Swiss-Prot record:
Organism placement in taxonomy: Bacteria, Pseudomonadati, Pseudomonadota, Gammaproteobacteria, Enterobacterales
Family annotation (InterPro entries): Helicase_ATP-bd, Helicase_C-like, Helicase_RapA, P-loop_NTPase, RapA_C, SNF2-like_sf, SNF2/RAD54-like_C, SNF2_N
Assigned EC number: 3.6.4.-
Oligomeric and partner information: Interacts with the RNAP. Has a higher affinity for the core RNAP than for the holoenzyme. Its ATPase activity is stimulated by binding to RNAP.
Binding-site positions, ATP: D177, E178, V179, G180, L181, G182, K183, T184
Function statement: Transcription regulator that activates transcription by stimulating RNA polymerase (RNAP) recycling in case of stress conditions such as supercoiled DNA or high salt concentrations. Probably acts by releasing the RNAP, when it is trapped or immobilized on tightly supercoiled DNA. Does not activate transcription on linear DNA. Probably not involved in DNA repair.
Organism of provenance: Yersinia enterocolitica serotype O:8 / biotype 1B (strain NCTC 13174 / 8081)
Keywords for this protein: Activator, ATP-binding, DNA-binding, Helicase, Hydrolase, Nucleotide-binding, Transcription, Transcription regulation
NCBIfam families xref list: PRK04914.1 (NF003426)
UniProt key word Phosphoprotein: no
GO MF annotations in UniProt: ATP binding; DNA binding; helicase activity; hydrolase activity, acting on acid anhydrides
Name of the molecule in the record: RNA polymerase-associated protein RapA
Length: 968
């Protein structure tokens, strides 16, 4: 093409320079000035990597002064172009703009503009973009979004609760599962769903101080959620950046004590516009009508300001009715305002729970029971259902299930309370206790005697705690150089036990970090036993490494030595051997120790080894835990109650273990108390609430669906393709692990979700669960989600040129592969993507205007194509520009009809689903006062907004690939 001064061109290789102007021409060279950057470039007149910029009618162009022109006509004179059209700011028609006046900062965002401007991308990027569109659209439509990406086993009751609650607007619920059933995971899944769906963006978690790091680790390791931990120093730091420090982060964890101590902090927290509040250990918030505790008032104030609230607490039976009422009052103060009224209401629900037990028992119902069911359900036309339920026909079971569902909807607190018990959940292992009685060394006997004399002024509690750990008493007197491990028979026993069980992973827990460190040294030096140490002095990364070393099957540690605090929140269900080198002071800590292995998903019996020294406080405590509470071999929901009531007697026996008088009677009394309380708990079981919380078949179905999706080969191939194109280094390791590290040639210098020092990932859920250092990659993992956003929000792969070698077609045959996107714009919380995600519509146009996409599938077509270099591509495009314009016009008419059908289908689906949801809630409100008015109002408003936004839906061209037939 001949050059003329003033013409506008763009560089094919340096598009960031913007629009260039021809400023000098000689026989062989042409000079372009790029005003946007002030740089000059010299090019050969023939075959140089630059493309002439020419716009067409219908395009919108920008003047260098900033105003825009909608092009209606294009004229050319002496090689220079003038555009004529309507000025958009003044609506003046017939306005001319010479090409020399075009804005030099011009960027081409439309795929066809980029194609004609020579900004042509690689063929593999086009394919990646189409796949990204296709997979993203499929993922948006799945209703269990937020549940699949968790790094946890697929436990039906957890999935059911998370799905039920996570789908609600501003959920306000009480999670009261028994210990070991995974309340933290349930809360994390609810948070994850609320964040992914856009229902929540700002999350506040308030926990006891000792659990802050556990929550921080759990949220990051299991859900890839990066929370910020606010303590005094972080608060002071943030105060420099903002008048309200809590507005500097979207997701915050802080301790209850941190908030309670300072009135200003509480006010700032309440004003920080959170969407969801999560409170752990909520049963410690003391309340009475006359004098609620300061802690309770703090959470009450936050709950008044924050729309969504999750309270994690002990089971209602453990709490007692008044304490249980106090938690419900935090969730819905209007509904639960009077304790007496609450008690009366609860008593009315007893017959409902009994009726469910009856229906589930499968026994024939008496006339009295049938009348009771009729009264409880109080619906018209209930008679045929009752008759079917009581018949011997095959319809009987279905009728009973329907009646149970109707009762469940009417159950007082079932919508805001979820409680699972171990009795109602299958999958827990047996626990077997092995007591190893060992002689008390003379060194310890002497140290204990001296300690008794010197510590006479200590409190009874302090002496009791001292007596549990004789090695510490000995070390206190002998100083730093005391080598208690040389004579302590527990050490010798541990060495022999580990040698005898070389093939078993063994978890050893002791009270103090110092003990764990000393034991590691002994195991290493005396028997070369590989051990990892886990204590509170380690950073999170060091703990992860220690846990991964223990988990590794190849060259991993045989033993993990844990301190009490260091083991909080970590689970090692791949091991089944637990050694308690000493014993904790209260039953909650004992259950926490066993809970490291006794989790759902543990598939072997747990062997609990307790080596203890005779005639010591350890011997007393072993007996009390085992004979008094049965706390080793079964979970002990009564433990805390009995511990509190018998505390004084217990610490007396621990402080003076040589005086055993009355111990047998004390243990016997505790056992009777335990059995009595246990019976009360069992009788008080609310079968209806358990069914509602457990989810039954629904939970099982969710687990199976997600397990099937775990094996998605599309994810693996897409992810590896994405990593290649983005420029992330991949190194295969054994055990289905891949190490990802940033490279120097990435599409973006800092890929979101990929740490600077890289990370280890796996696509295998089981592998991720057994390897603490491996991240579980799913469609919901930040690396994949950010990768999809990176590709789709930019121009990557939006235009390409390929060659098709096919002798059945004439040389030079032109095909245009077009990818349109049908989409609607709306606030994220409306979740429009459930009904109309950005949906790709692929077309393969020939020059006659025929769409061949239905006959030619994308992947098989893509495999037949060959790449073309950018320079040749640009020349090809220039040669066929008119034909491409014609093809685009023909495609526009065809895509309009397809888009209309998609939008209409989305509107029908949205209307049907949201109307049904609304009708169900309104019907329930008539029989169950726990349906909040604001929930119904929000749903009604959202339905209206969703339909309005779907009416505004449109479509656009997202990517274009020109395919030219060749025979070579």
């Amino acid at each position: 093409m001949p050059f003329t001064l003033g013409q506008r061109w763009i560089s094919d290789t340096e598009s960031e320079l913007g629009l260039g102007t021809v400023v000098a021409i000689d026989v062989r060279m042409v000079t372009l000035l790029f005003p946007a950057t002030g740089e000059n470039r010299l090019y050969a007149r023939n075959d140089s990597p630059i493309t002439r910029v020419m716009f067409n009618p219908g395009d919108t162009i920008t003047h260098h002064e900033g105003w825009q022109l909608k092009v209606e006509e294009v004229s050319e004179e002496n090689g220079l172009i003038t555009y004529i059209g309507t000025r958009l700011d003044t609506e003046e028609t017939g306005v001319s703009m010479r090409e020399v006046l075009l804005d030099s900062k011009l960027t081409f965002s439309k795929p066809q503009d980029r194609l004609f401007a020579g900004q042509i991308d690689r063929m593999d990027r086009f394919a990646l973009r189409f796949r990204a569109r296709k997979y993203q659209s499929e993922q948006f439509r799945l209703p269990w979004s937020g549940l699949r990406g968790i790094r946890a086993s697929l436990i039906p009751h957890q999935l059911h609760i998370a799905y039920e609650v996570g789908q609600r607007h501003a959920p306000r619920v009480l999670l009261a599962d028994e210990v070991g059933l995974g309340k933290t995971i349930e809360a994390g899944m609810i948070i994850h769903q609320q964040l992914l769906s856009g229902r929540a963006e700002r999350i506040l978690i308030v926990v006891p101080e000792s659990l802050q790091h556990q929550w921080l680790v759990e949220m990051l390791r299991r859900f890839n959620l990066r929370f910020s931990l606010f303590d005094d120093s972080r608060y002071s730091e943030a105060l420099l950046d903002s008048t309200n420090p809590f507005e500097t982060e979207q997701m915050v964890i802080c301790s209850l004590d941190f908030v309670r101590r300072n009135k200003q902090r509480l006010e700032q927290l309440a004003d920080a516009s959170w969407d969801l509040l999560v409170v752990d250990e909520a049963h410690h918030l003391a309340w009475s009508e006359e004098a609620p505790s300061r802690e309770y008032q703090v959470i009450e104030q936050l709950a008044e300001h924050i729309p969504g609230v999750l309270l994690l607490t002990a089971t209602p039976e453990q709490l007692g009715q008044q304490s249980h009422f106090a938690r419900l009052r935090l969730l819905d103060p209007d509904r639960f305002h009077d304790y007496e009224e609450f008690i009366n209401e609860q008593q009315k629900y007893r017959p409902i729970a009994d009726a469910v037990t009856l229906l589930l028992g499968g026994e024939r119902l008496t006339d009295d029971k049938l009348n009771l069911l009729g009264e409880l359900i109080n619906e018209q036309d209930i008679e045929p259902l009752l008759k079917a339920a009581n018949s011997q026909t095959e319809d009987s079971e279905a009728a009973r299930q329907e009646l149970v569902t109707m009762l469940m909807d009417r159950h007082g607190t079932s919508r805001i309370l979820f409680r699972n018990t171990r009795n109602g959940v299958k999958g827990f292992p047996h626990r077997v206790l092995h007591q190893i009685k060992l002689p008390l060394p003379t060194q310890y006997q002497t140290a204990i005697k001296v300690s008794g004399i010197m510590g006479a002024k200590k409190s009874l509690e302090a002496r009791a705690k001292d007596m549990l750990y004789p090695e510490q008493i000995y070390q206190e007197f002998e100083g730093e150089n005391a080598t208690w491990w040389n004579f302590d028979p527990r050490v010798e026993w541990l060495l022999n036990y580990l040698i005898a069980n070389r093939n078993e992973k063994v978890l050893v827990i002791c009270a103090q970090a110092a003990t764990a460190l000393q034991l590691e040294q002994v195991l290493r030096e005396r028997e070369a036993i590989r051990a990892a140490v886990f204590h509170e002095g380690l950073s999170l990364i060091e703990r992860d490494r220690a846990a991964a070393y223990f988990a590794s099957e190849e060259d991993g540690a045989q033993v993990l030595l844990c301190s009490e605090i260091g083991s909080e929140g970590r689970n090692f269900q791949f091991a089944c051997q637990l050694v308690m080198f000493d014993l904790p002071f209260n039953p909650d800590l004992l259950e926490q120790r066993i809970g490291r292995l006794d989790r759902i998903g543990q598939n072997r019996e747990i062997q609990i080894m307790v080596p203890y020294l005779e005639n010591t406080a350890q011997a007393v405590l072993v007996r009390w835990y085992h004979e008094g509470l049965d706390a080793f071999e079964h979970t002990c929901p009564t433990g805390r109650t009995i511990y509190d009531s018998g505390y004084q007697e217990l610490i007396t026996y621990l402080a003076t273990p040589s005086e055993q008088e009355g111990l047998d009677e004390f243990i016997h009394t505790c056992r009777q108390q335990h059995e009595g309380l246990k019976l009360q708990l069992e009788q008080g079981r609310d079968r209806l609430l358990e069914m509602h919380s457990n989810g039954g078949e629904h939970g099982q179905e969710l687990a199976e669906i997600i397990a099937d999706q775990d094996n998605d080969v599309n994810l693996v191939s897409f992810a590896l393709n994405l990593f290649d194109i983005v420029g992330i280094n991949q190194e295969d390791r054994s055990d289905n692990l891949i190490v990802l590290t940033p490279s120097d040639h990435m599409l973006v210098p800092d890929f979101p979700g990929l740490p600077q020092d890289g990370c280890t990932v796996t696509f295998d859920r089981e592998q991720a669960l057994s390897r603490e250092d491996a991240q579980f990659v799913s469609w919901e993992h930040p690396i994949i989600r950010n990768g999809l956003d990176l590709i789709l929000s930019g121009d990557t792969g939006s235009c390409a040129v390929s060659l098709l070698k096919n002798k059945a077609l004439p040389v030079g045959t032109l095909l245009a592969e077009l990818v349109y996107v049908v989409e609607a714009q709306a606030p994220k919380h409306l979740q429009l993507t459930r009904f109309l995600p950005p949906t790709p519509v692929r077309m393969l146009m020939d020059k006659n205007g025929t769409n061949l996409a239905a006959q030619v599938e994308f992947e098989s077509f893509n495999r037949q194509l060959n790449a073309v270099n950018r320079h040749t591509s640009s020349k090809l495009v220039n040669a066929v520009q008119q034909e491409v314009h014609a093809m685009l016009q023909q495609a526009e008419a065809l895509v309009e009809e397809q888009a209309r059908l998609l939008i209409e289908a989305a509107k029908h689906e949205a209307d049907d689903k949201l109307s049904a949801e609304l009708a169900r809630l309104e019907a329930l409100k008539a029989v169950n006062p726990n349906i909040r008015d604001d929930e119904i109002e929000t749903l009604e408003h959202n339905r209206k907004m969703v339909l309005e936004n779907l009416n505004q839906a449109g479509w656009r061209l997202d990517a274009i690939r020109l395919v030219v037939v060749t025979h070579q």
